[in-house]
C-alpha cells in the first residue's frame, strides 16, 4: 500500500496550486486526475483573473464581489481572497505567465463584468489555460507526481478522520489503495449535469458517501457567450475589447458596470435565448491576443468572428455550491467549529462563500489560486505532527470497491444495460428544463422524480 502525506484529487488549477503549496511545506504529494494529464477542463473559464493591483487596497473589489453575489457572500472570505490574490499575481509573473501589459510594463488591468474599476488581468482569450500550463511546469520542477486516468472511488476514514483514497487505475485496470494523512478534493462541481463537458464531480460524490454535507447547491454561474451546438465557450473579456452583443432583431444589449455574467445571460435569455456576438470592431491592440479564439471558432463553425457576427447562447459554466470550507480550505462538518479531520477542498468542488449567488468576472480563477494555496499550505503544515493510521478501514474500503465493481460486471448483459448516451440525454433535458433560468416547486419535484427513475 502506498503512503502519501497529501493526496490531491483533481489536476485542476486549484488542485495543482494546492499540491505546490503542500509540497513547499515539506509534504509528499500525489495528484490523481480522472482525465489524461493536461486535460483538466481549463478551457471553460469565462474570464481572466481579477485582482486590484492598480488600487490602493482591495475594498472596491470586495464590495463589487459582494454586490455581484447579491449580498449572500461570506464577507470575511471575500476580504481574505481579494487581499491575498495580489501576491499570487506577482508569483505568476515571476513564474513566466505572459500577461497583457500596460505601458509601464506591469500586468494590465481591464474592466470586467461586475466590476466598477479595471481589475481583470488576462493573457488574451486563454488565461486559465496559460495558468494551467505554468502550474504544470511548477509541478514538474518540484517533481510532484501526477497520475492521469485515475478515478477516485471512495475515501477511507476512521472515526471522522481521513485515512486515504481508493482509486481505479483506468490504464492498468486495477483498484489501488493510497494511504494519506490528508486529502484535498479539488476537481469540479456538478455542472456536467446540465450539458456535456470535461468536468468531473467524483470528489463531491465520494465526499457525500463519506458523510460530508454540501452547501449552496441552488446557485449556478452562467457563461453568456457560448456557441450553440458546440462545446465552445468564449471569454466575456472580449466585450471589454470592442465586441458587442445584439439580439437576433439587431437591438444592442448594453453591458454596464453593474452587469454580471449571470445578469447578461438572463438578458440574452429574455431576448429569446440566442443572440449575436459582433467582434468585427474589436480593438486593434486586442486582435493578436484573441487570434487563437478566432481560429478555434472558425475551425468549429466556419465563421470568421472578426468579419461576421456569430450566434451565442448562455450555458452553465460552474456550479457555485459544493463542500463547505473555511478560510484554510478545511471541510467543515455540522458547524463551523468542527471539520472532517484531514479533508480539504478547493476550486469548483468547494464552497467557501466567496461568490454568493453568482461569480463576477475573474473571481473564479482568483478563488482557484488563493483557495488552492490556502488548502495546500494548511494541509502541508497540519500533517507534520500526524501519523498514518486507519489501515484496516482502507482495506475494508478497497474490498468494498472491488466487490462493487465485480457485481456490476457480473450483472451486466445486453438485456439490462441502458445506453449511457440515452441516460445522459435524459439527465441533461430534465435538469436544463427544470433547473435553468426559471424554477418552480413543480419543476423541481418533476426533476427529482425523473432522477429517481
Language model features by range: what are they?
Residues 1-4, 21, 25-27, 37-38, ...:
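Glycine- and aromatic-enriched mobile tails/lids
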Residues 6-31:
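N-terminal Rossmann-like FAD-binding beta1-loop-alpha1 element of flavoenzymes
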Residues 35-64, 70, 221, 225, ...:
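Conserved N-terminal glycine-rich FAD pyrophosphate-binding loop of Rossmann-like flavoproteins
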Residues 68-108:
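Rossmann-like flavin
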Residues 94-174, 179-182, 186, 226-230, ...:
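Conserved redox-cofactor binding core of oxidoreductases
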Residues 182-232, 361-378:
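Glycine-rich loop(s) and the adjacent beta-strand/alpha-helix scaffold that form part
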Residues 206, 212-316, 378, 384:
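An anion/pyrophosphate-binding glycine-rich loop and adjacent beta-alpha core
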Amino acid at each position: 500500500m502506498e503512503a502519501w502525506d497529501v493526496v490531491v484529487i483533481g489536476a485542476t488549477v486549484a488542485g495543482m496550486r494546492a499540491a505546490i503549496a503542500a509540497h513547499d511545506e515539506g509534504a509528499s504529494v500525489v495528484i490523481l486526475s480522472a482525465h489524461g494529464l493536461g486535460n483538466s477542463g481549463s478551457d471553460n473559464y469565462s474570464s481572466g483573473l481579477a485582482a486590484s493591483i492598480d488600487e490602493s487596497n482591495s475594498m472596491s473589489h470586495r464590495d463589487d464581489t459582494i454586490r455581484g453575489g447579491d449580498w449572500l457572500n461570506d464577507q470575511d472570505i471575500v476580504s481574505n481572497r481579494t487581499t491575498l490574490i495580489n501576491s499570487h499575481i506577482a508569483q505568476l509573473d515571476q513564474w513566466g505567465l505572459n500577461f497583457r501589459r500596460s505601458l509601464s510594463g506591469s500586468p494590465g488591468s481591464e474592466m470586467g463584468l461586475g466590476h466598477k474599476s479595471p481589475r481583470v488581468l488576462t493573457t488574451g482569450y486563454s488565461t486559465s489555460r496559460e495558468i494551467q500550463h505554468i502550474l504544470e511546469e511548477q509541478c514538474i520542477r518540484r517533481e510532484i507526481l501526477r497520475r492521469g486516468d485515475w478515478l477516485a472511488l471512495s475515501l477511507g476514514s476512521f472515526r471522522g478522520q481521513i485515512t486515504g483514497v481508493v482509486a481505479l487505475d483506468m490504464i492498468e485496470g486495477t483498484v489501488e489503495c493510497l494511504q494519506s494523512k490528508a486529502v484535498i478534493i479539488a476537481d469540479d462541481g456538478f455542472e456536467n449535469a446540465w450539458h456535456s463537458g470535461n468536468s468531473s464531480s467524483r470528489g463531491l460524490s465520494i465526499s457525500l458517501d463519506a458523510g460530508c454535507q454540501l452547501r449552496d447547491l441552488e446557485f449556478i454561474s452562467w457563461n453568456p457567450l457560448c456557441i450553440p451546438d458546440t462545446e465552445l465557450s468564449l471569454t466575456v473579456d472580449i466585450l471589454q475589447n470592442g465586441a458587442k452583443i445584439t439580439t437576433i432583431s439587431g437591438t444592442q444589449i448594453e453591458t454596464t458596470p453593474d452587469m454580471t455574467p449571470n445578469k447578461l445571460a438572463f438578458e440574452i435569455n429574455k431576448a429569446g435565448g440566442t443572440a449575436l456576438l459582433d467582434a468585427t470592431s474589436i480593438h486593434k491592440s486586442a486582435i493578436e491576443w484573441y487570434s487563437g479564439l478566432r481560429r478555434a471558432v472558425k475551425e468549429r463553425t466556419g465563421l470568421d468572428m472578426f468579419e461576421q457576427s456569430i450566434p451565442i447562447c448562455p450555458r452553465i459554466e460552474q456550479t457555485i455550491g459544493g463542500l463547505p470550507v473555511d478560510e484554510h480550505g478545511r471541510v467543515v462538518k455540522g458547524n463551523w467549529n468542527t471539520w472532517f479531520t484531514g479533508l480539504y477542498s478547493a476550486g469548483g468542488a468547494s464552497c467557501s462563500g466567496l461568490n454568493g449567488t453568482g461569480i463576477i468576472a475573474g473571481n473564479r480563477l482568483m478563488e482557484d489560486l488563493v483557495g488552492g494555496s490556502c488548502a495546500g499550505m494548511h494541509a502541508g503544515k497540519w500533517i507534520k505532527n500526524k501519523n498514518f493510521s486507519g489501515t484496516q478501514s482502507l482495506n475494508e474500503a478497497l474490498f468494498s470497491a472491488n466487490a462493487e465493481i465485480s457485481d456490476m460486471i457480473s450483472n451486466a448483459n445486453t438485456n439490462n444495460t441502458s445506453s449511457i448516451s440515452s441516460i445522459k440525454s435524459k439527465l441533461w433535458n430534465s435538469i436544463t428544463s427544470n433547473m435553468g433560468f426559471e424554477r418552480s416547486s413543480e419543476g423541481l419535484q418533476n426533476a427529482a422524480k425523473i432522477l429517481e427513475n
